Amino acid sequence: MATEEPVIVNEVVEEQAAPETVKDEANPPAKSGKAKKETKAKKPAAPRKRSATPTHPPYFEMIKDAIVTLKERTGSSQHAITKFIEEKQKSLPSNFKKLLLTQLKKFVASEKLVKVKNSYKLPSGSKPAAAAVPAKKKPAAAKSKPAAKPKAAVKPKAKPAAKAKPAAKAKPAAKAKPAAKAKPAAKAKPAAKAKPVAKAKPKAAAAAKPKAAVKPKAAPAKTKAAVKPNLKAKTTTAKVAKTATRTTPSRKAAPKATPAKKEPVKKAPAKNVKSPAKKATPKRGRK
C-alpha cells in the first residue's frame, strides 16, 4: 500500500509541469501578432503619391503675375486676381477660388504679400524684381527707334524751305506780320516792329498838316510837340519836322496867347449852350 502512493504523486507533478510548458508555447505567438501590427502602422507613414502633377504654375507666381500686369495703385482685389488667373490659366481645379484664398492668407502671413483693406500688393522689396520682367521688352523698343530716325532725317529738309519763306516775306512791311506768326528768325521780329512805328509817325504828322491849314493859330503849338518825337525817330521824320518849321516863320504874326485859350473855349460852348436856352425864355416873355 505504501508503495502505490508515491507513484500517484509523481503523476500529479508531471501534470502540473505540462500546463507550464503550454503557457510558454502560447506566449511566442502573441509576439508575432504584435510584429504584424507594427508593420501595419508603418504603411500610413509612407509618403502619399500625388494623383496627377499640377498643370498650372505655383500660386505665388500666378498671383505675382496678376498684380504686376494689373498695375493698380492701391493693389489688386481677390476678385480681380482670380479673374485674371482664370483667363490666363484654363486648366485649374474646381475648388480653385478656395485654394487661392487660403494661399493669399498664407502669403500675407509670411510677408510675401501686403494686404491693404481688401486688396493685395507686393512688398516694396519685390518690386525691383518684378520690374526686371518688363525690362526685357526694352531691346525691342530700342530696335524700333532706329526705324523712326529716318523720319527725323526727312524733317530737316522741310525746315530750310520754311526758313526761306520768312526771309522772302521780311522785305515788305505788310507781309512781315504773317511771317511773325509762322515763327521766323529772331532778327525779323525787331525789324517788323520798328517799321510800323516809323510809318505811324508820318501819319500823325500828315494828320497834323490839315489841322494847321484850317487853324493857323493852333499850328505853332502842334509843331513844337511834333519836333520832340522826331528827335527819336529816323531821318525821314526829321525831314518832315524841317518842312514844318519852315512854314511857321510866315505865320508868327498871330497872337501867342490866343492859341492856348481858344481850345478850351471851343469845349466850353457845348456846356454854355444849355444855360442861355433856359434864360432866353423869360426875356422873350418880358418883351
Swiss-Prot record:
Family designation: Belongs to the histone H1/H5 family.
Molecular-function annotations in GO: double-stranded DNA binding; nucleosomal DNA binding; structural constituent of chromatin
Stretches with biased composition (Basic residues): 33-51, 135-202, 276-287
One Pfam assignment: Linker_histone
Keywords tagged on the record: Chromosome, DNA-binding, Nucleus
Subcellular location: Nucleus; Chromosome
Region (Disordered): 1-58, 120-287
Main subcellular location of this protein, as a coarse class: nucleus
The protein, known as: Histone H1
Organism: Solanum lycopersicum
PANTHER family, A to Z: HISTONE H1 (PTHR11467:SF143)
Gene3D superfamilies: Winged helix-like DNA-binding domain superfamily/Winged helix DNA-binding domain (1.10.10.10)
Record field: compositional bias (Low complexity): 1-11, 203-248
GO biological process: chromosome condensation; negative regulation of DNA recombination; nucleosome assembly
